[in-house]
Curated annotation (Swiss-Prot):
The protein's name in its UniProt record: Uncharacterized lipoprotein RT0028
S-S pairs: none
Signal sequence bounds: 1-18
Localization, UniProt: Cell membrane
Parts of the chain that traverse the membrane: 288-308, 394-414, 423-443, 458-478
Membrane topology: Multi-pass membrane protein; Lipid-anchor
Similarity comment: family membership: Belongs to the TrbL/VirB6 family.
């Protein structure tokens, strides 16, 4: 029986290999998408019938791009070399002499014409879809035929757009348009293809790689093609296209078709699962039962609370309300399915499908079907396989082994598919039972039933994921071997040659299969058929499979090596063996060159992979069950482990404890101190390593999106506004500048890049002119240096780099803050869990503040009582005698100095400051709550300006008041921080502070003021908005002066400017593009106005913030001077002056220019 099945399989595969329709198959072709694009259209498709002004629709390829490099090759065609003028071989078109029947063939006159050449020796911008380009192509040898993709364009249409909706959209569609006829040699590679006669020829095509956000923006967008001409009625011919990568393959996979069919029956819009679920929920008996259960649960909860049987904490209350809300939804027949499907069941249905799709895409490391089975049985793969039969005596053995391997792989994948379908059906059955088991979560006695139900759902969802993850891993190994062993070209060779058959039957056989034009008997043979180094040619080509580029920059650290997707990177390889690296695969290359096409080591690795796959299939289910069931037994396992560990550790520690007791105290102290120091050293190293990792992560594509949203919400920095390469650009700019300085090599780029722009300017001044700083330069030197720095664009680069560094710091702080609130690795990526942990953290903080306040009130009352006792004793016995006996009479610890306190406050003073700290924490929590509500940084100048623009004056005043209070608290924290506080405790300042100490405090206040301005995340943005302001101001002044000079007027208002600009353009320009010029000028003017007004408003807000910092610091300086005055010391008045400015509105600025 098995032998009959094997024979049938062999015959089927032999027949399948003859269905390719191609005379030759390229080395990297394992099932490419191929279709034709005709140069002719039906008359009703043409929009304009006037000669020289026809517009044709774009041809829909029926495929969508997937974001990977889009690689399209145009087949070569040459009639002189033997290619035929048939629909199966023709890949050229002619703009002359065509008839209606020349849709897929050339007109007889055009067959023997030469390919077109061009006067400018280039094909750039030829016949672009831009309606403004009405120039003909610069053809030097008309009439001729177009080949290699000349005149053919592809279009990646923007989502939700139709390029054929109107003639204008056909001329100028929305999306990405590229010409396939450009010379690929200009970008460093060539396309090669095997012609129908077996010759390796250069081909046309394009390799388009997306820029920046275009990859995600255009993913799953439709792909169109069109040969662009101005008159289509006399065209003839077509292009044959081969899409090598970059599109989602929609060709049906048998097993995938079966899976989708069953999934649609079960979970479709009118699927069995949904109908059955709704029938259960709509049953009156079920609704009555759920209502009764909810009533009982609420009654038991209230009764248990009244008799003190349960302690309803905030968390417990929220949990119970959450349960009641969930169960109540089951009573709503309209919302029951929608709610539970969208928020729970979708993870087990669509979530699993999405994960499997990601796994399959990751496993598809090269051309051909994403499915391993589809790759192995593709006609191209089988054709290459059977070509081995007559070139090597081992070919027959290899074919038999391959078919045996294919037999096992088919049944293993079929088994995996059955497991997946079984899991899907089981998940569906458990979802049907969901309305029953969800109710079981209410009571402790039934909660285990709900948990087991949920655990089983997770188990059956994990089974296909784990199973197909293993299959994907093994398939990557098998794919690599298939590409390496069968990655060569093949062609059909006829025997015997029946040339006259084509003359007898015409083109009938050619329409069925082009290769039947000469003979109905043929076989596949490799290209080249024989070995020899002369038959193999090296060239720069696109590497057709995923690989890692190992160069000198990453030899020692492969993690830094670049990973290239299929057809993304260029490398020098043999054209006939594009999958083999010249260095790593030199052994196999030598085998091919020596005529040994059969690689038995590859088939051996495939069998090893099959064996691993069979073992993995058997363990995948048990692995999923173990993962899903671990949580239920984790506590017991931990208890057993802990008990066994304690009994063993006690026996081990006995002699150690005895020895430790005999060691003297100084020795143990030194050991403890050394251990602590070592721990601190490693902890510091680890923390620094983690911080550096977070800094790199913040600027990489792997940055955590949730942390980025937290940065945007709390710090007002959107990752989209950050130039991820700004720091490197700034360093490169400094490096270029230093190369132009005579003594530039004395300065270090890294050190300079950490400085502010003004500090950098001082360093450059000192290096170039041997002066102290920029202020000591002469006027000529300043002018020269300013021009040098402006040409280097260092100010803008420094501003961008500082903004990027601020983003890195905010990312680190946001990550640490989220971790500090109990939000771990999983919580950062799961919205519900993150909100729950945030809520729990907020409750804990409020509870802690409440407890601290209660203790503080008690201590404050007692401190007041002891203060009254102390004042009474001072009145009776005097200050000196009081100080002598204070320790025994008045609880002096409340009013004496805390010598462990850096500010030497009394305990009573410390209590007052602690109360202020609690107020600050409450304010911080309130601001965080407001920030969460609006999902924006409410304290940022940018947000306040946006509110003012929107006319929300009351909100602006409210948020400004919060910002003012928060800023005052922040300034106080900076001034009174440990180390060098600006002011000590009140009693110390009155009784102990010396003249020099107070002078140092005032000087320290000035130093901390500078630090406050430098580190404040909002004032640091001043340089960024200064640049925007100055650029907009310069542009507006120039525009105003041009309009002023043109109309000879001085009293021009801002309202008149748009009309005057438009009139000025009309007066000074002529031609068809005048409307476009007017629009461009007005857009530039409006953009400058917008930038000026926005930057002015933000800068004024920043100045207000700086003034607040100045005022708060000056208040502290005044207090110190007051203490000095009371102590009869000399005045040391040294207030801080904020040299800020208030910027004028645009209207006032225009008036000032008149």
């Amino acid at each position: 029986m098995k032998r009959n099945i094997f024979i049938k399989l062999l015959i089927s595969l032999l027949l399948l290999s003859s269905c390719t329709g191609d005379t030759c198959i390229d080395p990297d072709d394992f099932g490419f998408i191929k279709f034709n694009v005709s140069s002719r259209y039906n008359p009703e498709e043409i929009t304009s019938r006037h000669e020289g002004d026809q517009v044709a629709p774009w041809r829909d390829s029926a495929y969508k791009v997937n974001g990977y490099p889009l690689t399209i090759m145009v087949r070569p065609w040459n009639y002189i070399l033997g290619d035929k003028n048939t629909s199966g071989q023709l890949s050229a078109w002619c703009p002359w002499y065509g008839q209606k029947n020349n849709t897929t063939t050339l007109a007889p006159f055009c067959i023997k014409l030469q390919p077109c050449t061009f006067w400018d020796n280039t094909r750039l911008d030829m016949c672009t879809p831009n309606p403004e380009n009405r120039n003909d192509a610069m053809i030097s040898n008309p009439p001729c035929i177009m080949t290699d993709g000349v005149g053919l364009y592809f279009l990646i249409a923007a989502k939700n757009t139709d390029p054929n909706i109107s003639p204008d959209s056909q001329r100028k569609p929305q999306g990405i348009t590229r010409h396939l006829g450009e010379l690929t040699s200009s970008v460093g590679y060539e396309f090669y293809s095997i012609s129908s006669t077996g010759q390796l020829l250069k081909a046309g095509g394009i390799n388009y790689q997306y820029n920046g956000e275009d990859k995600s923006k255009y993913a799953q967008s439709p792909l169109y093609f069109k040969i662009i001409d101005k008159f289509y009625d006399d065209n003839s011919g077509q292009y044959r296209l081969v899409i090598k990568s970059g599109v989602s393959d929609t060709r049906p996979d048998p097993l995938q078709f079966l899976t989708d069919l069953i999934k649609d029956v079960l979970f479709g819009k009118n699927g069995i699962i949904k109908k059955t679920y709704q029938q259960i929920v709509d049953t009156p008996g079920y609704r009555i039962s759920v209502s009764a259960i909810l009533t009982l649960y609420i009654m038991f909860t209230g009764l248990s609370f009244l008799i003190g049987n349960i302690n309803l904490t905030h968390v417990e209350l929220i949990i119970r309300i959450f349960k009641i809300s969930i169960i109540s939804i089951l009573l709503s027949s309209d919302k029951a399915w929608t709610f539970f499907h969208d928020y729970l069941f979708v993870f087990f249905i669509d979530g699993v499908q999405q994960i499997l799709q990601i796994i399959n895409e990751a496993a598809a490391t090269g051309p051909g079907s994403q499915s391993l089975l589809g790759l192995l049985i593709s006609t191209q793969t089988l054709s290459k396989l059977f070509s081995l039969l007559f070139v090597d005596w081992l070919g027959f053995i290899y074919i038999i082994l391959y078919l045996i391997a294919l037999y096992f792989i088919f049944f293993l994948i079929f088994k995996a598919t059955i497991i997946y379908l079984t899991a899907l059906i089981t998940i569906g059955m458990m979802i049907i039972m969901g309305p029953i088991f969800i109710c079981f979560m209410l009571f402790n006695i039934t909660r285990s039933l709900f948990e087991n139900w949920l655990r089983q759902l997770i188990s059956y969802a994990l089974q296909p994921i784990i199973l197909f993850a293993g299959i994907a891993f093994i398939s990557m190994i098998i794919r690599t071997e298939i590409y390496s062993t069968l990655g060569f070209g093949v062609c059909k060779h006829d025997f015997p040659n029946l040339g006259p058959i084509n003359e007898i039957f015409g083109s009938f056989l050619e329409d069925i299969d082009p290769s039947l034009s000469n003979s109905i008997f043929y076989w596949w043979f490799p290209v080249p058929m024989k070995g020899g180094i002369n038959n193999f040619h090296k060239a720069k080509i696109l590497v057709p499979n995923d690989h890692i580029v190992v160069d000198d920059s990453c030899k020692n650290n492969h993690d830094k090596c670049k990973h290239c997707a299929a057809y993304e990177c260029i490398d020098e390889r043999y054209i006939e063996l594009p999958f083999l690296d010249l260095v790593k695969d030199s052994t196999r290359i030598n085998n091919f060159i020596n005529g040994k096409f059969v690689q038995l080591d590859g088939i051996l690795l495939i069998f090893v992979s099959i064996y691993l796959l069979s073992k993995f299939n058997d363990t995948a289910i048990s692995t999923a069950q173990f993962i899903a069931g671990t949580s239920g037994n984790l506590t017991d396992i931990q208890k057993v482990n802990q008990q066994s560990y304690e009994s063993v550790s006690q026996q081990i520690n006995r002699p150690l404890n005895y020895v430790a007791k005999t060691i003297s105290t100084p020795v143990t102290s030194r050991i403890s101190a050394g251990t602590a120091q070592a721990n601190m050293f490693f902890a510091e190293k680890f923390e620094n390593m983690m911080m550096r990792r977070l800094e790199k992560q913040a600027l990489s594509s792997s940055a955590n999106k949730v942390v980025q949203n937290e940065v945007k919400r709390k710090y007002g920095i959107d990752s989209k506004d950050v130039n991820m390469n700004a720091i490197k650009d700034y360093e490169d700019g400094i490096s270029r500048l230093l190369n132009n300085l005579p003594k530039g090599n004395e300065l270090k780029v890294k050190e300079l890049s950490q400085m502010k722009f003004t500090q950098l300017r001082d360093k450059i001044s000192a290096n170039k002119y041997d002066v102290q700083d920029y202020t000591t330069l002469s006027t000529e030197q300043k002018t020269e240096l300013d021009k040098l720095l402006k040409d280097a664009n260092l100010r803008v680069l420094a501003s961008d780099a500082n903004f990027t560094k601020d983003y890195q710091e905010a990312y680190k702080h946001a990550h640490q803050e989220m971790s500090g609130r109990g939000i771990g690795l999983f919580g950062k990526n799961i919205g519900v869990l993150r909100s729950w942990q945030e809520m729990e953290h907020s409750i804990n903080v409020k509870r802690k503040l409440k407890e601290e306040k209660r203790i503080g009130i008690g201590e404050k009352i007692y401190a007041g009582y002891t203060g009254i006792k102390r004042a009474a004793l001072t009145t009776i016995v005097g200050k000196d005698l009081r100080d002598a006996y204070e320790g025994n009479l008045t609880s002096a610890e409340w009013h004496d100095f805390e010598y462990n306190d850096p500010r030497l406050r009394t305990y009573s003073e410390k209590l007052k400051d602690d109360e202020k700290a609690r107020e600050r924490e409450k304010l911080r929590m309130h601001i965080n709550k407001e920030t969460l509500a609006v999902q924006a940084d409410i304290l940022s100048p940018e947000y306040l300006v946006k509110l003012e623009k929107a006319g929300r004056k009351s909100d602006v005043e409210y948020y400004q008041e919060l910002a003012q209070r928060q800023l005052i608290y922040d300034v106080h924290s900076k001034l009174f921080e440990e180390g060098e506080p600006v002011m000590m405790g009140d009693r110390f300042m009155r009784e102990k502070a010396t003249d020099s100490q107070m002078r140092d405090m005032i000087d320290n206040a000035h130093k901390k003021y500078v630090e406050l301005i430098d580190v404040d995340r909002y004032t640091r943005r001043q340089e960024y908005y200064d640049i925007i302001y100055e650029k907009a101001k310069e542009n507006l002044e120039q525009t105003y002066k041009e309009v002023q000079d043109h109309f000879k007027r001085d009293n021009i208002s801002i309202e008149e400017m748009p009309a005057l600009i438009a009139q000025k353009v009309k007066d000074t320009n002529a031609g068809s593009e005048i409307d476009k010029k007017i629009t461009e000028e007005l857009n530039n003017f409006n953009a400058d106005v917008k930038n000026y007004e926005y930057s002015t408003a933000v800068l004024n807000k920043i100045e207000d913030r700086k003034q607040t910092i100045t005022d708060v610091v000056n208040v502290q300086i005044d207090k110190i001077n007051k203490y000095r005055e009371n102590a009869k010391m000399e005045q040391y008045v040294k207030p801080i002056l904020n040299e800020g400015r208030k910027l004028r509105t645009l209207e006032d600025h225009f008036k000032n220019m008149k």
